[in-house]
Amino acid sequence: MWRLTGILGRALPRLLGPGFRGITPKPTSSDGPQTTSTTLPLPRVNFDRSGSHGSKRNRDPKCCGWKEAFHWMSAHVSPNTLRDAVSWGTLAVLALHLARQIHFHAPLVAGPQSAERCSWHSPLYRFLSSSWWHPHSSLRRHVLPSPDCPAPRNTGLREPRLGQEEPAARSQGLPSDSSLKPGLLNLPEEEPSDFGFLNASRDFTSQAKAAEAGPPGGKNEQDKPKALPLEEAVTSIQQLFQLSVAIAFNFLGTENIKTGDYTAAFSYFQKAADRGYSKAQYNVGLCLEHGRGTPRDLSKAVLFYHLAAVQGHSLAQYRYARCLLQSPGSMSDPERQRAVSLLKQAADSGLTEAQAFLGVLFTKEPHLDEQKAVKYFWLAASNGDSQSRFHLGICYEKGLGVQRNLGEAVKCYQKSAAMGNEPAQERLRTLFNVEAAGPSHLAIGLKSFSSPSLCSLNTFLAGASGLPHASSTGNLGLLCRSGHLGTSHGAPSRAMPSLERSLVRLGFG
């Protein structure tokens, strides 16, 4: 509405007709003569008229004149004329706004080339910015934006233009008449970073489309496996169903192991293993190896261990490799290397049993490697295996794979003894008995370590006997002769955890 004032000031006098212009309202006083003025248009009224009407009243002549003019206009001008004037003025304003909107949105529809032609230097702009229009003209001020306000830019919607095309387009769009230069708007140039970003995005999009298109032959090859999505979905559902059933059977087997029904447990493990479940295959191998719920058959146990090991089950890899290495000497070198490779995979996955077994294995021929033995002893000891800590102490005492260090050896023995390892406790007693018997080279080394006295050592060992301890592999030679894992010379009372505990603990992991 604020733009209507300037438009109506010029449209209203022209639309009311020539007879209305220059006429002043008729005075209401009866004794004053009527005067006319043909020089002043509405809404200004001539107040220099004779008569006693103007001198007798103490009113503002300007306010009185406007009021009389309004009454005269209401009396002599029909309402239709005023309505037409307002309507035509409103239509003119709407037409100018519509032209301006069309002028702004034309580049969006026409594209980059049309955007150059439909720029701010259009015929409408050149017409309104010509020299014969006053700079403060109401029509020009209301239609064209002010120089302080930047020209509207739709950078997010317009096509980006190349930097080489901009100067030429701008030079063509500028008018040649020098008189138009003072009235032209200073259009802010678009930042080159915006163009660089949009061009980079467009290039990236085009490269991505080109990469997706690719050679026609490769695209057809990629589409071939996706020809039967329904069959693939059905197969996936069947596999999920089989896996769910296998998990349920394996769970039932572990529950029957807890209750002591080994026959039913082995039956459930067998059903789950037939569906390819690696944990159930490992449990079947345990039952066959120890003869729980089925006659003992080591060859079948090795077969099921192998099936689970192929699927990446670390415990199955360890037991399968251990069974191969414990077999008679008829095993070929490729099979032996394969067993060692499986042990390394299980040890690298963090399995403590495999790390301890490899440490013992690398102390024997034909796999003798003292440095690797120390490495795997240290890994297993870091994971809490007391027997590997004891073996690491032997390496420090004898200088196997490491520099001989009696102080570190005693540290390892003490840590292993604190975890309840009986061979480590016996070794510590032997060392301190030698120290108490008389000075020797060994005693000098022990004194430098500042070891505790025998009384305090006995008290310490008595308190440590009740601590929890981890099972270990023991000596490899004893393991091959006895066939049981976790026993060692000097510790006959220590045994491997029961099968029931192994199944419950390992049935899901």
From Swiss-Prot:
The record marks 142-143 as: Cleavage. The keyword ATP-binding does not apply. Residues 19-60, 143-185 are annotated as: Disordered. A motif (SIFI-degron) lies at residues 307-326. Residues 1-23 form a transit peptide. The keyword Cytoplasm applies. GO terms for cellular component: cytosol; mitochondrial inner membrane; mitochondrial outer membrane; mitochondrion. Residues 26-40 have a biased composition (Polar residues). One of its GO terms (biological process) is response to iron ion starvation. Residues 24-101 form a propeptide. TPR repeats lie at residues 213-245, 246-278, 279-313, 314-351, 352-385, 386-423, 470-498. InterPro entries: ISR_Activator, Sel1-like, TPR-like_helical_dom_sf. Signal peptide: none annotated. One of its GO terms (molecular function) is protein serine/threonine kinase activator activity. Transmembrane segments: none annotated. Residues 46-60, 156-168 have a biased composition (Basic and acidic residues). Keywords: Apoptosis, Cytoplasm, DNA damage, Membrane, Mitochondrion, Mitochondrion inner membrane, Mitochondrion outer membrane, Repeat, TPR repeat, Transit peptide, Ubl conjugation. Gene3D superfamilies: Tetratricopeptide repeat domain. Belongs to the DELE1 family. Protein kinase activator that acts as a key activator of the integrated stress response (ISR) following various stresses, such as iron deficiency, mitochondrial stress or mitochondrial DNA breaks. Detects impaired protein import and processing in mitochondria, activating the ISR. May also required for the induction of death receptor-mediated apoptosis through the regulation of caspase activation. The TPR repeats bind to and activate EIF2AK1/HRI. Interacts with DAP3. This is DAP3-binding cell death enhancer 1. The gene is Dele1.
